[in-house]
Amino acid sequence: MAVGSTPKKPKQKRRSSDHRKHHNHDDDAATMASPAPPRSRGYGAYLRRCFSPPSALVVLCLFLLCVIWKRIPISRLPPPPRFYSFDVVNEFPHDPNAFTQGLLYGGNDTLFESTGLYSRSSLREVQVYHQMDGSLFGEGLTLLGERLFQVTWLENTGFIYDRYNFNKREKFTHQMHDGWGLATDGKVLFGSDGSSTLYQIDPLTLKVIKRVTVRYNDHEVPFLNELEYVNGEVWANIWQTDCIARISQEDGLVISWILLHGLRQGLLRSGHTAIDVLNGIAWDKEKNRLFVTGKLWPKLYEIKLRPVRGPSNGRIENLCPIRA
């Protein structure tokens, strides 16, 4: 090649072509590293990848759980038990010789009381007194209309009295194993016999129409004693304790506990050492007043409940031995 002549271009073209090939190779590699969005004809495969068997199974399980949860009858789940202590509103004198077995509010600041012990059992009102047969041991008492219903201990015998003059209207035989407590909602009678069974009794035929077993934390609650009906619940003294169980009349579950240990302890500290256990609940539904007393207690108390987190000195089973 002569001096000063220009270089041939084919060689440059070859170099440029090699450069383009190298550049295109890099682009292809980049394209392969980032998958292209699925084409319209490839959506089936794309969906199959998104909804693979494990993913579909998870979605199906979540759906079934939602369906099952919606079908659970939430109303049947028992509410968590609550606990109540008390404040004393008023104190009233009470016959210290009255072995209280039944107590109820009769309106117009009148209380009716049934007392026990052989030869000392009675049915009484303030300034009114009816001596019972000495062979009978008076127990639970309730008022329905103008009739006072009373049951007796170790007998399947009960009596119906006129509320105004205590004249005995009728003697009846009941179907409970024993006579301990009575209450009413104005339609049926509720009865207890010292077991864990809460009875419903027809006030006309005096036949048992329903039984439920009272339970707390999957355990039966025995020794149901004096009863009272309060705002849709049946309240029961638990024999030999200072506890009141608030019971659902429908299924027998204990809704909450009322802890009244302080009342008896206060009487003991005051020197009243002859007293027996708490027994006697009366509810004034017109004024929302609650009265309680005990066997051989010299005082009757009007109290107001206040909720507490739980028993202050141990489990409820330690304060209210509810297991037989």
Q: Language-model features: where?
A:
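Signature of short aromatic-glycine-proline-rich micro-motifs recurring in repeat-based ectodomains
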Residues: T100, L224-E226, G271-W283
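Beta-strand-rich domains and repeat architectures in extracellular enzymes and scaffolds
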Residues: P54, D87-L123, Y129-T142, W180-G181, ...
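Conserved beta-strand positions in repeat-built beta-propeller and related beta-rich domains
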Residues: N108-Y118, G145-N156, L189-S195, V234-Q240, ...
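Short, low-complexity, Lys/Arg-enriched N-terminal segments of secretory-pathway carbohydrate enzymes
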Residues: M1-R48
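Surface loop/turn motifs at the tips and blade-to-blade linkers of beta-strand repeat domains
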Residues: E91-P96, Y129-S135, E170-M176, V212-E220, ...
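Blade-loop segments of beta-propeller domains
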Residues: V126-G179
